[in-house]
């Protein structure tokens, strides 16, 4: 890697062999971005905090796993201790946390991670309102792709203490944080998936093609804005 180049580390939190195109989607967005950054993907089982020293930004991916399982599955929690350590101790390198990554960030700062009593949100698109635009999100009303069972309440005192809550939603009866950023550090955490699935994923009879296309465009812009933020932050 070029020492002067902006470098992004993508941590893949999906179990090996799990069928998903989300990591490939993130990689494609990074490769095609005019921000022209270099990147490396590392599976969470191989991640060590010392790896981030040469990087300008870190992306924590989603997963089919649930952080709420940490409360009774110590073995699972142990697999992510390195990422929890990174989130707690990193003061310099910007972090973009997506869905499961969002929950890792919240958990690292002492928030309660709750699980829906139903089967969760299986890849639907919802519209959310953002209180104010910022470095990543430039519109106040956007469609986003959600696919999760865990959620974080906007009333959580540790979230309110450490994060600026920029978007919440009431989805299938649950109040949840959709977007937050750390009050002092460059940590951006999204409950939703900006790495929206490829065009073939959304069934045309269930989701309007125009909304699906806008969701992909908005998500891609969010990731690209993070890349630009990392580039400027490096300078």
Question: Residue ranges of each PLM-predicted region?
Answer:
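Post-Walker A helix-loop "phosphate-sensing" segment adjacent to the P-loop in P-loop NTPases
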Residues: 111-114
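Hydrophobic/aromatic ligand-binding patch that stacks against planar heteroaromatic rings
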Residues: 86, 104-105, 179
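Amide-donor transfer/coupling interface in amidating biosynthetic enzymes
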Residues: 3-20, 32-33, 49-50, 54, ...
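Flexible gly/pro-rich beta->alpha loop and the following alpha-helix that scaffold active-site loops
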Residues: 31-96
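Gly/Ala-rich beta-loop-alpha elbow adjacent to hydrolase catalytic centers
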Residues: 97, 101, 106
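Short amphipathic alpha-helix
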Residues: 22-30
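Glycine-rich nucleotide phosphate-binding loop and flanking beta-alpha elements
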Residues: 65-67, 102, 153, 198
């Amino acid at each position: 890697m070029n020492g002067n180049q902006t470098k992004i580390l993508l941590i893949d939190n999906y179990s090996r062999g799990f069928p998903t195109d989300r990591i490939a989607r993130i990689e494609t967005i990074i490769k095609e971005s005019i921000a022209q950054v270099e990147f490396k993907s590392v599976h969470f089982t191989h991640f060590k905090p010392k790896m981030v020293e040469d990087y300008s930004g870190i992306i924590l991916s989603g997963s089919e796993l649930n952080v709420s399982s940490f409360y009774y599955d110590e073995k699972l929690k142990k697999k992510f201790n390195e990422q929890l350590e990174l989130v707690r101790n990193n003061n310099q390198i910007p972090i973009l946390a997506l869905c499961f990554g969002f929950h890792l960030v919240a958990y690292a700062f002492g928030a309660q991670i709750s699980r829906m009593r139903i089967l969760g949100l299986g890849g639907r698109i919802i519209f959310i309102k953002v209180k104010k635009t910022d470095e990543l999100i430039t519109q106040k009303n956007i469609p986003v792709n959600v696919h999760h069972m865990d959620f974080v309440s906007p009333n959580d005192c540790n979230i309110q203490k450490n994060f600026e809550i920029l978007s919440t939603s009431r989805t299938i009866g649950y109040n949840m944080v959709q977007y937050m950023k750390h009050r002092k550090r460059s940590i951006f955490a999204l409950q939703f998936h900006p790495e929206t699935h490829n065009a073939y994923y959304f069934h045309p009879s269930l989701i309007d093609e125009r909304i699906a296309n806008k969701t992909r465009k908005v998500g891609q812009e969010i990731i690209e804005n993070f890349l630009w933020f990392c580039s400027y932050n490096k300078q």
